Amino acid sequence: MPHVDTKAGFVRENFNKIANKYDRFNDWNSFLLHRIWKNRLVREIEGNLSDRLHVMDLCCGTGDISVRLGNSPRVDHITCVDFSENMLEIAKTRLKKQIEKGRVRFEIGDATELKNFQDFQFDAVSIGFGLRNVDDLSKAIREILRILKPGGLFLNLDVGKVKNPWIRWIADFYFFKIVPILGYILWGGKNEMFDYLPVSSLAYPNQENLKSILEKLGFQEVRYKNFVFGNAVLHIAKKPL
């Protein structure tokens, strides 16, 4: 990460650069499976909370999860937060209908400092493939816990760790060797962001460790669902009543 002082700064700078290619990149590198996983995230919200929900889509990127939340009859209002201005601009174009209905708010912000939001403000907070990019994981989780209402849910979809050594070898080869090449093809040349995306998984906690971190910081009833042998994982955590 040569050009900026922090991981968050690097990520913001480079997500702004690749914003208009990001959705296609996700389709390519996951064989469209990320769409199914995001649908599952929204179904978890619908199945575990009541109606007229106020949901924050944190690290919302281009609004992939936000669009799905907007289509849910259970969700009354969506707050989209990301520190990439270019990503947010794409999200705004995808959520035009929800903007016209007054159902969505956009905010440039950092997951570790949600100072524009009150305590106990949201019924649920979602993150899709963003938590591993924050500078301070624990600080971000504490902020999420703070803004959730008692009984509210935090749903985090991100990369996971595969236990089976043979499948892990195949997954690592694909993730570290093939995925950057897909990015270069899409970009039309080398871009350091497509090298960073696989590398970012190395320091990110595995499924059980993230579960333990969430519990230690105050969440309860923490569970997770593995996808594709654990290559991706959805954690669901509840704020105590």
What is the predicted role of each segment?
Residues 217-241:
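Core SAM-dependent methyltransferase catalytic element
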Residues 123-137:
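A short SAM/SAH-binding and catalytic strip from SAM-dependent methyltransferases
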Residues 54-114:
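Class I SAM-dependent methyltransferase SAM/SAH-binding core
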Residues 157-213, 217, 223:
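C-terminal alpha-helical "lid/dimerization" subdomain adjacent to the S-adenosyl-L-methionine
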Residues 112-125:
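A short acidic, Gly/Pro-enriched loop at the edge of an enzyme's catalytic core
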Residues 1-23, 186:
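N-terminal, positively charged/glycine-rich alpha-helical extensions of SAM-dependent methyltransferases
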